[in-house]
Amino acid sequence: MDKLAHPLARGASWLLIYLTAVQPLHPAIAAGITAANGNTQVAMKPGNVPVVNIATPNAAGISHNTYQDFNVGTPGAVLNNATQGGKTQLGVTIDNGNARLKGKPAELIINEVTSGNRSELKGRLEVFGNKTGVMIANPNGITCDGCGFINTPSVTLTTGKPQFDKQGALDALEVKKGAVIIGGNGLDGAGAEYVDVISRATELNGKINAKTLTLTQGANRVSFKDGTVKPIAGEGAKPQLAVDTKALGGMYAGKIRLVATEAGVGVNLSNVTSTQRDISLTTAGKITLSNVKAQTDLNISGREIVTLAGSSVRAERDLTLAATTVDNRSSTTAHGDMRVFASTVRNTGTVSYTHLRAHETRRHL
């Protein structure tokens, strides 16, 4: 009798095939945080919370840590930037300070993934000790689905590779590929002053909450010296959209800025609200908008601007639209000036403003 003819044998064989097939799909999730070398040490604490003793800061105050895997589960993770022990806000007891600091805490913690695995962030990442900025850099992509940050003034999620000057300071990020995906549980960046997403593309399935939110999209060299964004050659095909907002996605922040540089790559934005200051949206392609509200000014520029029917686009002060074609189908309101710079304007929605300053060559009302 064939050994595989028995039902139990066939079942075991299929189970073995299944496990062999699916295991490679989740290496990053299983791996947690794995340092690439001995400069960074990772220890697991009770409650499945990894504590990372970060690498010795360089002369510029940067602790540059490299990993095979950098994933944060729902219990969270801790970056130890303390010179003394204590208890973290996540409830983890740390007996001793991080000896790698040599008495001098880092001013910026860079966590760079050098393998081929994406990063999955599903919990809160805490800086223990001196408050400092945190960067997670993974060219393969980053998924944030319920991630948050504790004791850090600035958070950067990037698919770029960090570039350093001769003094060891962060010079730029070079982005050639990779997407940041915000899952249904969102990104809570409200505890930081600044949240930056620097990637070739971003997908919003959940909400980003922040004080000051900046998205820089496309294949770019992003300077940390003067803030300039210079397009460079990307790897692989262009994304269909630089930013794509799904049904439950959105951005909520005190101030919002978006720059998308790849020619012909569009942006789909909905549920975008600034609670304190302005919103600035700039793209080299088509930008489609629905339910956008700026507490002060709203500035939008692109090759083509389309506002969707059944939605609202609103500025509590001035609203500026600059494109080759502006196609307004929404309820569009400016409590101050409305400025329109376009070759063609189509309006099948409603428009309300205090003053209109239009500069177009052709208009369809």
Residue ranges: model-predicted function:
Residues 148, 187-191, 205-209, 249-252, ...:
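Low-complexity, polar/charged sequence tracts that form flexible coils or short amphipathic helices
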Residues 354-361:
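Conserved small/polar residues in nucleotide/adenosyl-binding loops
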Residues 13-17:
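Hydrophobic helical h-region of N-terminal Sec-dependent signal peptides
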Residues 5, 18-275, 282:
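Solvent-exposed adhesion/ligand-recognition segments of exported proteins
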Residues 3-12:
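Bacterial N-terminal signal peptides that target proteins for export
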